[in-house]
UniProtKB/Swiss-Prot annotation:
NCBIfam families: PRK05422.1 (NF003843), smpB (TIGR00086). Belongs to the SmpB family. One of its GO terms (molecular function) is RNA binding. This is SsrA-binding protein. Residues 145-158 have a biased composition (Basic and acidic residues). The gene is smpB. InterPro entries: SmpB, SsrA-bd_prot, SsrA-bd_prot_CS.
Amino acid sequence: MAKTSNKVKRNANKANIFKLLADNRYAKFQYEISETIEAGIELLGTEVKSIRNGKANLRDGYCSFRDNEILLLNVHISPHKNVGSFFNHDPLRNRKLLLHKKEIIKMKSSTEKKGMTIVPLNLYLKGSWIKLTIGVGKGKKLHDKRQDEKQKSIKREINSALKR
């Protein structure tokens, strides 16, 4: 019988650890998210350092298709402060998302419907890898947002009444 080493066990435990680095609460308010997928991102070294320091902003980000690839556009990752300007990255550059071909086809078919778009939701560490959760969503109208706010306030009131 083969014996598993302690190193393998430690690495398996590290893969289950999640650390949230950036969250797009604005997208959850603006869009009605119907489907989510976890994707990897193609990053430069200075981008990884900045993201680990919490210097990423997903608020205005969205995804686009080009040559059977999904690109992450308009996501701001601040330049790393301890690196010279020659070696630093462009904060708003387009970044390729790493997905399987079937997942790309599925996302593309779901966004062909009118009003559907792909937005980044969360940026987090999974083990030592930086992952991004993207979601397919449809933009909410003003009255939809108001209804959501009413439902949240009703839930808050019910929970506070139950705690008493």
